[in-house]
Amino acid sequence: MPNTFNSTLKTFTLALGLVLLLAGCKQNSSEAAFDNYHQRLTNVLDIDPTPVPNTNVLPLPQKRDLNQALPDIRIGLLDAYELRQCGLFQLIAERNSILGKVQDKTRSLQYELLFLNGLSYCLTQLKPDSDLVAELTPIYQQKQQQLPMIFWNMIFTGEEWRKQLTLGHELVDSEKNSEFLTSLSAFSYVADLVNNNVTTTPAPIAPTLIEKKYQDLLHHQQQIYNSRYLGDLFYSLARTTTWLNAITAQLNANQDLILCGNNMNQQKAKYLRNVFYKFYVADIQRYLAHLDSQYQQIQPVLQQIHQQLSQAPIQVTPDMQGYIDAYINGEAYRQFHQATLDHVKFWQRLFKQCNFKVGQ
């Protein structure tokens, strides 16, 4: 019996190890494609591959460095009771409860949006000369001024949204397009919320009719909970830039080894051309186009959010400004695009020098 158990355990362990190995290979397939391309080029040139340096990325700063401190402006239950005709009493009672005081950043934003709408609605329903209007008006104005900071805190310190923007450590899987679409949908929804509530002031709606208006915010929060796709996309831009720059530099440094011209043996150049088509065009170029397309879709959304929120007096640390410049304003993408162009230019020169026709 012990022998049977040990045999079964060994079989299970080996099977588990194989599964993990295969999973690891699949996760790193894009990195492996660059490594394979690099290795084959150096094999043709008969040189040692230059070690590819580590990729230095700008991390998302810690929560404590990003959180915007806000004074807690509340209406007491006594005053709130007078607002029952506006439908605000239940909302304020829930906020003042124990559970209301420990809301996550997304639910806090949802509450503030509902509360602002309720206040605005009340101000249209109460008599203009009432004491309550005089009390509520400055509260409404202060809350409206705080709204950009509340959005900022949700995006950069809220667990689910922050996870999306935290840089990963491996290249994205180009087959996981659904994760990207989920992230794009979530941040596009937030961009619309910012535009409709910060950039402009929406017309108030009766609280009983608006209850479900911001449920989609919680839906998107749930959808992105287990994903960090955008952070992986940002890392992928930086990592592929490192790869391309390293490979291009080595090709340029060894160009004298590639003979082309009349009465010359162009065999090495032809082998390089084969590597270019088989491994760069077929795999690498397609992957680079995938990254390019996804970033160009998400970047305008993130930039729109940032530009609209930056109209408010938000305190941004130098480290955060570096992160914003790199991944939201597009500096990392600019470097990625330049690295791609530099690599393609090497091949254009080689094809011209060796009189190779494109596609042959």
Regions found by a protein language model. Give the residues of each.
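A cross-kingdom marker for long, charged
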Residues: N28-N54, Q223-Q360
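Alpha-helical interaction segments
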Residues: A15, Q141-Q142, F151, A332-A339
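Context-gated lysine
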Residues: K10, K26, K63, K101, ...
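N-terminal Sec/ER secretory leader and immediately downstream segment
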Residues: S30-S183
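Extended, low-hydrophobicity segments enriched in charged/polar residues
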Residues: I139-N252
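C-terminal motif of bacterial Sec signal peptides marking the signal peptidase cleavage site
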Residues: L21-G24
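Bacterial N-terminal signal peptides that target proteins for export
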Residues: P2-T13
